[in-house]
């Protein structure tokens, strides 16, 4: 993990609370100390934090996790306040700024909102801010019961194109048998995320405060692998676990993707999106895409055809109609009509704002 420069770190409820008696500020301080050290070493960091419901339960004096939706949502709303304040104050002690982001799965399934969230997160990371992400439990419906922050963390890893997803849990990793029942159980140090043999050993459920058992963690690793991210499922009670992972120590279970990041992303783009429009390119843009594999700039587009929204797939063709590439447009068809033929520096003048300097970024282009 020494070469991974963008990490998504997910910390479960059991590691942030004092045996269900509210947030453990000392434990959170230890986590922040480790994450601040990673930051100092040049790692771009996104934190997915559980604990809001558990913190709210403690404030309300509840000892058992309620099953009623409205009670869970009330606990989440109350606990989120203290959770964010605790992270903010702890990171401030190390000179680090934080930003709160509450997401639902709908935010990441709607392409326009997905792109907006991605732009915001990338900007925060580039500013050296640590985004603190949680599921917006107070407004979702069945997600609060069936959703989990392991899955959210994997989707965030896809969103920010992370190199590494670290899922910190109260177990040391994945075992070939349940270590609570079998003293001969062996830790699985490394495997492919898509290995079907892992399904048989990922049984069990989460604890009383959390929602995610090992099955959800395996599913999260497979989601993260779609964009080429590695996942480490590792015990959060291991001393200096993040620093030791950064140093290359073999801890927990490393689940690797089948393909590299770019190849996985290209396959996802090619296989899962329908085209919504066409961009007719000039000869210079055709050469820039086909030979130099550069991004598509507005200046190289002659004509916009069809109706598409920001984030939808469009076909890029040469003047003679030959298909050159496909990609995700950073602008809608209406916006693209206004900026084609102009330099990137002119986008603000034409639209009044600039979402991205490219019409299609090269990472979102597939040559055909």
UniProtKB/Swiss-Prot annotation:
KW Metal-binding (keyword) present: no
Q: What is its EC number?
A: 2.7.2.11
Q: Which reaction does it catalyse?
A: L-glutamate + ATP = L-glutamyl 5-phosphate + ADP
Q: In which pathway does it act?
A: Amino-acid biosynthesis; L-proline biosynthesis; L-glutamate 5-semialdehyde from L-glutamate: step 1/2
Gene Ontology MF annotations: ATP binding; glutamate 5-kinase activity; RNA binding
One short Pfam name that applies is AA_kinase
Keyword vocabulary terms for this entry = Amino-acid biosynthesis, ATP-binding, Cytoplasm, Kinase, Nucleotide-binding, Proline biosynthesis, Transferase
Q: Does this UniProt record's set of keywords contain Cytoplasm?
A: yes
UniProt xrefs under InterPro entries: AceGlu_kinase-like_sf, Asp/Glu/Uridylate_kinase, G5K_ProB, Glu/AcGlu_kinase, Glu_5kinase, Glu_5kinase/COase_Synthase, Glutamate_5-kinase_CS, PUA
Task: Name all PUA domain ranges.
Answer: 276-354
- The source's superkingdom equals Bacteria
Q: What's the top EC group for this one?
A: transferase
**Can you tell me which residues bind substrate?**
50, 137, 149
Q: Give its localization.
A: Cytoplasm
Alphabetical list of NCBIfam families matching this protein: proB
Q: What does this protein do?
A: Catalyzes the transfer of a phosphate group to glutamate to form L-glutamate 5-phosphate.
The protein depicted here goes by the name Glutamate 5-kinase
């Amino acid at each position: 993990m020494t070469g991974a420069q963008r990490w998504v770190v997910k910390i479960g409820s059991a590691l942030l609370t004092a045996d269900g008696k509210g947030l453990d500020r000392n434990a959170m301080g230890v986590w922040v100390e480790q994450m601040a050290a990673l930051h100092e070493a040049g790692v771009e960091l996104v934190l997915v934090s559980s604990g809001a419901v558990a913190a709210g339960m403690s404030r309300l004096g509840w000892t058992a996790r309620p099953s009623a939706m409205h009670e869970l949502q009330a606990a989440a709303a109350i606990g989120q306040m203290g959770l964010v304040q605790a992270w903010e104050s702890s990171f401030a002690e190390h000179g680090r700024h934080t930003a709160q982001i509450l997401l639902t799965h709908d935010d990441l399934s709607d392409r326009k909102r997905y792109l907006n969230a991605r732009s915001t997160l990338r900007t925060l990371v580039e500013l050296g801010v640590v985004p603190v992400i949680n599921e917006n439990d107070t407004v979702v419906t069945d997600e609060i019961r069936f959703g989990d922050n392991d899955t959210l963390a994997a989707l965030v890893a896809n969103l920010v194109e992370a190199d590494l997803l670290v899922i910190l849990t109260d177990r040391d990793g994945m075992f070939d048998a349940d270590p609570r029942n079998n003293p001969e159980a062996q830790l699985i140090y490394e495997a492919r995320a898509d290995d079907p043999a892992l399904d048989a050993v990922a049984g069990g459920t989460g604890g009383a405060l959390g929602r995610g058992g090992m099955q959800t963690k395996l599913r999260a690793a497979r989601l993260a692998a779609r964009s080429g991210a590695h996942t480490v499922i590792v015990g959060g009670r291991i001393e200096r676990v993040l620093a030791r992972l950064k140093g290359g120590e073999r801890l927990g279970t490393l689940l690797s993707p089948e393909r590299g990041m770019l190849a996985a992303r290209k396959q996802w783009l090619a296989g899962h999106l329908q085209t919504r429009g066409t961009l007719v390119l000039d000869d210079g843009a055709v050469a820039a895409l086909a030979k130099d594999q550069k991004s598509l700039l507005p200046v190289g587009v002659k004509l916009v055809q069809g109706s598409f929204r920001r984030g939808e797939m469009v076909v890029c063709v040469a003047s003679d109609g030959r298909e050159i590439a496909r990609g995700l447009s950073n602008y809608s068809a209406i916006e693209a009509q206004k900026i084609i033929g102009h330099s990137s520096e002119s986008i603000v003048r034409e639209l009044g704002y600039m979402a991205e300097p490219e019409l299609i970024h090269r990472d979102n282009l597939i040559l055909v």
